[in-house]
C-alpha cells in the first residue's frame, strides 16, 4: 500500500517560541556542581538515546572544565538503533568519543560503565587528587534522562544494594547535588547525583519539541495537543505504524484530530459540554481530546508504539 500521502513535507509549529517553554537556566544547580568540580575525576553525562544529538546542555562543557567525559545514551530500548553507526560518527565529529548505550531498567550495558570510567581516569592527570585512592565522578544531564536510574543500576550491579536516588517519570525529581554515593567497591568509586539542567537557549522549536516528547520538559509547558500532532508526524515519517493496531484503526492516519477521536472513544475518554441550541442549553457528550493526547504521548514513552530516532 502506498503511504506517501501520509508524509507531511514539514511540521508547522505555528507561532510558538522556544523561550516560552522553559524555566530559568537552573543556575542554582549549576553553581552547586561547580563547587564539587575540584573533587572530581570524571564527568558522566546521561542523555536520552532517542535524541542523542539534540538538547545536550553546552553549559556542561563550558562550566565543568576539561575533566574526562563519558556520554551515556540511556533508554536504548526505546531508540531505533539501526541509526547507531551514524549517531556515533556525528558525536565523534563533535568531540565525543566515549559513548555507551544503556537500558538502566534492565541493566543492559551497565557492566561496561565502571571499566570505561576507570580507563578514562587512569589515562588522565588527577590534579589535587593524587593522594585519593577512590575515584569520584559526577552524573550530569538534562531532566528525566535516567541519571538516578543509572546510579541505582550501578549500585545493584557492583554493590548488590538498593536505591540511593529517587527515580520519577517527570523531570525535576532530583533537586540538588547530593552527598557522595558509593557505586562500586573495587575499584572504589563514589559519585554525586545532580539535578537536571536545561540549556537556557534551545537551538530551535523542533529541538524543544523533541525534548518535550522524551519528557525532559513538563508537558503543560509545551501543550499536549501539539506534542501529539508532532508525534504522529514523526511516527508516519519513520513508517512506524504500530499505533494503528494499538488503537484499533483500519489504516495509518495523517490527521491528529481523527486519531485522538478514535483514541478517546476506544478508551471511553469523553466529557459533557454545554451546547446552546434553539430550544435552550443542552448537555452533549464529546471526545476528550486532551485525555486522548495524554494517553498517546505516554504510550509512546513506554515504547508501545515502536522505537524511533528523533535525530
From Swiss-Prot:
Ligand binding (GTP): 74-77, 144-149, 196
Keyword Mitochondrion part of the UniProt annotation: yes
Claim: Isomerase is one of the keywords in the record: no
Chief location bin: mitochondrion
Transmembrane segments: none
UniProt GO molecular function: GTP binding
Domain CP-type G as annotated: residue spans: 27-200
Pfam families on file: MMR_HSR1
Alphabetized PROSITE patterns for the sequence: G_CP
A cellular-component GO term for this protein: mitochondrial ribosome
Family: Belongs to the TRAFAC class YlqF/YawG GTPase family. MTG1 subfamily.
Primary role: Plays a role in the regulation of the mitochondrial ribosome assembly and of translational activity. Displays mitochondrial GTPase activity.
Protein name: Mitochondrial ribosome-associated GTPase 1
Organism the protein comes from: Xenopus tropicalis (Western clawed frog)
Lineage: Eukaryota, Metazoa, Chordata, Craniata, Vertebrata
Record gene name: mtg1
